[in-house]
Amino acid sequence: MGTSQADKDKHHDRIVAIAATRVRERGLDGIGVADLMKEAGLTHGGFYRHFGSRADLIDEAVERALGEGTKRVASGPKASGKNRFRTIVDGYLSSAHRNSPGSGCAVAALSSEAWRGGKRVRQAYTRQVKLYLALIEDMIDGRRRPAVRRDSMLALSALVGAVAMARSVDDEQLSLEILSCTAEALKSLVAHS
């Protein structure tokens, strides 16, 4: 008996969802097809009914992981402007976010990986960076445009870089200090704008 299109779509979605989590946790090369399909409860042989290649899976997984970040921001804190920015900074630069790359921001998780990806991966990453820059610009209003753009670039770079560094060091105290000092500096930045 064959599989219905609805079941195939459901399976495809499950595979991509798991891969989106794994790509944030393990990077672009950290996903094995056999293990992924097993985790999805499907056979290894069924992979090619869903994807033309492993690269196609990675492209979809990265797009999904990045898109989930957009949804999180949209459903996030309801404060506006600078207050919203401060709330986002506190959540983003938390030990909970640092400790959960699989459910965290894909821009941070893939910051040292995206350049190795194919065209779709880099385009998706670029779109997400531009989206986050625009969101930050909207939150830190009140300055002439060039300064807002510069400050949003600084803020996004600091957020992503701090999380990447905090995840990478093997000294818990240093990791927490990276997060807290960056949060303090970013809040100071918007307080003076």
Sequence positions of predicted segments:
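Active-site oxyanion/phosphate-handling segment shared across diverse enzymes
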Residues: 129-139
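Hydrophobic/aromatic-rich alpha-helical bundle segments in the mid-to-C-terminal region
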Residues: 119-127, 140-193
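Helix-turn-helix
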Residues: 14, 18-56, 60
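N-terminal intrinsically disordered/low-complexity leader segments
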Residues: 1-10, 193
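Hydrophobic alpha-helical connector segments
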Residues: 60, 74-104, 155
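Solvent-exposed, amphipathic alpha-helical segments
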Residues: 14, 18-25, 72-75, 158-165
